[in-house]
């Protein structure tokens, strides 16, 4: 299944089969990616047209909404999914299907203009970056969209994106569209069907971007494997204080400790957790307490300003904890998961076998063996020879670290 649907598509299908809540959607196969490079963009659109539109109609029926409708719109995300995990190498587009008319319709439907225009400005930014080529190649280069956001925040006198007013968010949408026109000479597409095809083809193109090619060389992944494209109905973590988004691991990827851990943000979308725009909060209480201790934050301040999900959303935390345990037992390995909470309902967007350090690799393999989840042969095969080198290098003693004087710290 992974060979055809890619890792992400296969895991979404599998999660659905075992009763884990995933949003409805469809996956375009890895073979299509290779065909894209053989026959070109226009021919691929022609070949896929009927199947993609039928799959969109099926998703519409399941979500009871319509793609491109003003009264009851369906928005989708478009994500890449190679056979082997390639974290952060390829591109994702969220909130696809928005235009000025759909945004106005969504405001009437939800009564939440801040959420709608926050989603809209994110979409224009992602689409401009990924599909229309405005994403900076190097980290040192200035992202034109981020420069615009900083200017608007300064004008409004706020420091966080989430504190921007509805008027400022509307202004961002217009400024982003103007930046796209100025830099590419093309207008931002307003037809949702055109947006969808642009995103699908951009994911296929991202298989051959510089980062992805370099990563494949390092990991020994063949070019001909191609990437699948997963199109999924949007669920929103930025609909208010009962919505959230996060990433989590069934065990500690750093040291292998059998401790569920991760980070989440209330009233945010997926990219925010890893983008460094806001400080994410810990999922478990123990993780939150450890983080606060390292950061020199008192327990009172931690509880008031940075509560864990276990404390802030106890019922959802229980559900998340039970499902992550279910997934680890299903895959017999440590899982790296992404989730969204939309108005109190939990959805899983992804699971994969988590990347880990050499120390964690050995500990997790031995723990899973002792827990009866894997056999000895599997435990040995889980230990990558090149990572064993990490175990031969000196590391800090935890006790010594706790007594050390902190000179400075990063994110």
Task: Show where each model-derived region lies.
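Long, structured protein-protein interaction/assembly regions in large complexes
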Residues: 409-411
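Nucleotide/phosphate-binding sheet-loop regions of phosphoryl- and nucleotidyl-transfer enzymes
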Residues: 1-406
């Amino acid at each position: 299944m992974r060979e055809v649907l890619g890792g992400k598509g296969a895991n979404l299908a599998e999660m659905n089969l075992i009763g884990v809540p995933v949003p409805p959607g469809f996956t375009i196969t890895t073979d299509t990616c290779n065909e894209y490079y053989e026959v070109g963009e226009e021919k691929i659109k022609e070949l896929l047209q009927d199947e993609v539109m039928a799959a969109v109609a099926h998703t519409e029926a399941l979500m009871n909404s319509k793609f491109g409708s003003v009264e009851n719109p369906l928005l989708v995300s478009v994500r890449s999914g190679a056979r082997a995990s390639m974290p952060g190498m390829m591109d994702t587009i969220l909130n696809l299907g928005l235009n000025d008319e759909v945004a106005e319709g969504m405001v009437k439907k939800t009564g939440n203009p801040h959420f709608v225009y926050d989603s809209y400005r994110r979409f224009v930014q992602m689409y401009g970056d990924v599909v229309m080529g405005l994403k900076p190649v190097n980290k040192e280069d200035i992202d034109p969209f981020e420069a615009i956001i900083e200017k608007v925040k300064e004008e409004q006198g706020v420091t966080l994106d989430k504190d921007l007013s509805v008027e400022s968010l509307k202004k961002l949408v217009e400024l982003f569209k103007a930046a796209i026109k100025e830099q590419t000479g093309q207008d931002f597409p307003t037809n949702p069907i055109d947006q969808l095809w642009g995103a699908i083809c951009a994911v296929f193109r991202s298989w051959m971007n510089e980062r992805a090619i370099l990563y494949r060389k390092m990991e020994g992944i063949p070019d001909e494997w191609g990437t699948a494209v997963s199109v999924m109905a949007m669920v929103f973590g930025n609909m208010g204080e009962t919505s959230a988004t996060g990433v989590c691991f069934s065990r500690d990827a750093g040291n292998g400790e059998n401790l569920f851990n991760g980070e989440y943000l209330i009233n945010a979308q997926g990219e925010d957790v890893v983008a460094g725009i806001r400080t994410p909060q810990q999922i478990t209480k123990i993780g939150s307490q450890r983080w606060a201790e390292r950061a020199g934050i008192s327990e009172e301040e931690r509880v008031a300003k940075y509560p864990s999900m276990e404390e802030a959303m106890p019922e959802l935390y229980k559900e998340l904890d039970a499902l992550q345990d279910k997934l680890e037992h299903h895959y017999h390995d440590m899982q790296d998961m992404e989730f969204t909470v939309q108005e109190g309902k939990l959805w899983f967007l992804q699971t994969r076998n988590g990347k880990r350090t050499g120390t964690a690799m050995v500990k997790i393999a031995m723990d899973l063996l002792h827990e009866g989840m894997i056999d000895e042969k599997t435990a040995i095969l889980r230990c990558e020879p090149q990572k064993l080198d990490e175990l031969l290098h000196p590391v800090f003693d935890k006790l010594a670290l706790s007594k050390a004087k902190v000179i400075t710290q990063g994110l």
